């Protein structure tokens, strides 16, 4: 199972770096920062499905 360490999030701004991650909501997040901010917003219900686009 793929995991991402989201300690230290949410961050107020994310870079435009593109390293896609696919969330358990079947949505592609542009990078770890965007994904981790969404994880925090979801109160931990969002998880990583896999690295790369959905």
Swiss-Prot record:
The keyword Lipid metabolism does not apply. Disulfide bonds join 6-36, 14-33, 22-54. It is found in: Secreted. SUPFAM superfamilies: Kazal-type serine protease inhibitors. Residues 4-54 form the Kazal-like domain. Glycans are attached at residue 43. It comes from the Eukaryota. This is Ovomucoid. GO terms for cellular component: extracellular region. GO terms for molecular function: serine-type endopeptidase inhibitor activity. The record marks 16-17 as: Reactive bond 3. The keyword Repeat applies. Avian ovomucoid consists of three homologous, tandem Kazal family inhibitory domains. InterPro entries: Bifunctional_prot_inhibitor (IPR051597), Kazal_dom (IPR002350), Kazal_dom_sf (IPR036058), Prot_inh_Kazal-m (IPR001239). Pfam families: Kazal_1.
């Amino acid at each position: 199972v793929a995991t991402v360490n989201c300690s230290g999030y949410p961050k107020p701004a994310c870079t435009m770096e593109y390293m896609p991650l696919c969330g358990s909501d079947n949505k592609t997040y542009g990078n770890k920062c965007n994904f981790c901010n969404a994880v925090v917003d979801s109160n931990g219900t969002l998880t990583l499905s896999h690295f790369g686009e959905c």
